[in-house]
Amino acid sequence: MTTHDPHLLTLRGLAAPLLESPNPLARLNELTLSAQGAAVCGHILIDLLEEHDLAIGDYDLVIAPEGDAALAAAMIHAAGGRGLDLDATLFLPAQGPASAINNAEGERRFSGSPLSGRTAVLLANSALADGEEILAAATECGAQIVGCASLLPDEAARAFAAAAGIVYCSPALGD
């Protein structure tokens, strides 16, 4: 697909080496923690969600696996640059029973902005993340998940979103 979007063109150039590797998701931080990558990644994801009829305002929270903190921060900064408010929270790996609040110690499964009463999109870029587990935990905490975005195309995330009945989007990184 031909594009003239400068953000997408930059992302395509930066992501090319990742896409050629055997496990591009494992190398995603090389992109999201670089100056150029961080500057475009948040804009790309916000634009993609808008193209799928999910504008900021339709959601006010990004939920990301712990390993995708840089990508969540990129979205916050991109939204702020547009004069919009967006918060994020990170999903922490389970340390015990699979619930949003674990056992008597009250161990939290999320770190960041509160989830209760929030409408959220889920970032699905970490090879270590289980979308169903995050969705269940977020729902248990009172959040409504309306979409799932992935910076790199991910068939598992696409299948998860379809099964959950939520929007899925990822950029077209090919020509």
Label each residue range with its predicted role.
Residues 47, 51, 77, 81, ...:
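Short, well-ordered alpha-helices that flank and scaffold nucleotide-derived cofactor binding pockets
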Residues 1-58:
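Active-site-facing substrate-recognition patch
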